[in-house]
Amino acid sequence: MTIESKNYPPIRRVNASQGSDAAYQILQEDGCVIVEQVICPNIIAKISDDVNRVMDKATIGAKKGEQTHIINMHNRTIHMGDLVLTSKTYRDELLNLPFAHEVLEKVFKKDSGDYWLNMGNILNMLPGAEAQRPHRDDYLYPVSQHMDPATSPDLMINITFPLNEFRHDNGGTLLLPKSHTGPNADFYANAEDLPAAEMQVGDALIFTGKCVHGGGANRSDKPRIGLALAAQPGYLTPRESNVNVPRDIVETMTPLAQRMIGWGTVRTKDTYGLNMLQDKDFHEALGLKSKTA
């Protein structure tokens, strides 16, 4: 798929007060949507404080073995996972955010059944960071390249929360709206020509794994920090494992949040159980406790 025209559609937005149906409708039509005021900025500030305390231990640039040529990972970006252990607010608030789950239910329930996390990740674009090459997140799973994007079920939904303001000049996520139904191929475009998801703290960008996108170049003098929460059908193996989370922490989480991090049985649309233990439900077999929502 060669991207030639610079007359790209705008990234449409709704206010969270308009409801998840309004956001889902645009997501279906464009492959991406900005939802304004979807979460209290104070919640994001608490997560940001937790992240900043350990940011100096995070990976700078690409990890060994990563296919860096696909998305142009470089030494001016910091990637950080392990958010379940890093932030109680992330565990309690973000993993249970009602608006997010309303959208995810609409996307996955009919075609796939239950969903869980692919990963929760911090992407810190430092000053001087170059733009990523436009790409699709679905390419993480090779089967996606044998599927017709226009008719196949979604394999991933990314919900990105800005931890500080997202602008075109500081590396705000660049997207090509309506690209989610185009053919599978390499993508060629001047990333800087794509529209940027400009957002304030408390907003969120939701886009499908089929939507062509990439991190923008940071030409400002301050970092641009985002938290990406990626969800996928429960029949796909997540990128990030949470087996390192101690049981005593897991048992402080809701059943929904536990399932999101892989500590729970998921059901396909045909109700078959996956991630079971001793042929029993995960919680039953382990006697796993949980917190009431």
From Swiss-Prot:
Pathway: Secondary metabolite biosynthesis; terpenoid biosynthesis. Its cofactor is Fe cation. This is Dioxygenase andA. Fe cation binds at residues 135, 137, 213. Signal peptide: none annotated. GO terms for biological process: terpenoid biosynthetic process. Belongs to the PhyH family. The lineage of its organism: Eukaryota, Fungi, Dikarya, Ascomycota, Pezizomycotina. Pfam families: PhyH (PF05721). Disruption phenotype: Impairs the synthesis of anditomin but accumulates preandiloid B. Homodimer. GO terms for molecular function: dioxygenase activity; metal ion binding. Its EC number is 1.14.11.-. The keyword Glycoprotein does not apply. Dioxygenase; part of the gene cluster that mediates the biosynthesis of anditomin, a fungal meroterpenoid. The first step of the pathway is the synthesis of 3,5-dimethylorsellinic acid (DMOA) by the polyketide synthase andM. DMOA is then converted to the phthalide compound 5,7-dihydroxy-4,6-dimethylphthalide (DHDMP) by the cytochrome P450 monooxygenase andK, which is further prenylated by the prenyltransferase andD to yield farnesyl-DHDMP. Further epoxidation by the FAD-dependent monooxygenase andE leads to epoxyfarnesyl-DHDMP. The gene is andA. Keywords: Dioxygenase, Iron, Metal-binding, Oxidoreductase.
